């Protein structure tokens, strides 16, 4: 049987080009920011232009280009090969779609045969209104339009098990310690995640608690490899009060604790983007560390891709009602 898997992320322009950043910012404002911030309609174009311009200027000044979409492509190819090894009797096809970039999820779904099942795999560390629920809502709306024309099911898979993600992340960090011959009592481990609102304007799952559990689980596994384990949030500014401590405050605490060697790992992201890479870079250089190791995200790490494949395969043996994304 032919089976389809769609990896879904926000997407992100690869270059600082203002037109691309503007369109991306506009789509995020319409599809995400208004979920958490009651922004009047007339202000949306102004905010989109401001956000697009600020990203263009920052990326240009930092000579930065986002690897997110190219990484997602590599993840997709790796996952397809892992699925073929795991269940060779099926004909696996892994695709990539984005929430706020082309190809959009609905565009990809329209292109797939109506009689072939589809599993959608949101590439986020925690399930929240800003991650998996966006995909679920998109699929529900799309399915209502598709109606009876869609014979095979379309399912949005849950997030990876928290302890499993922590295991994979901790082993990834441990391998980096061994390869680089670093770590010990004079090193600090700094764990970074995307921030979220503490008091959203309406009840919603923010993913904060799940993210904190993953962070704590990584810390438990690696606490004896470092002199201290710290965590911080990469926050935005609009919409209200955000998660604490912000990364700036965390790094001040690390420095005040006497650490001069830092291993920085953005555990809350499954693929590198401007927030995991560029924001971390900017915050870290505000201090005169002796040594900084900025680890990439899990990206296409073989153990991580293998875990994704097992996740897809185990999900497929469950009853359809348990997995329905519509």
Regions found by a protein language model. Name each.
Residues 1-326:
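Extended amphipathic ligand-handling, pore-lining, and cofactor/metal-binding catalytic surfaces
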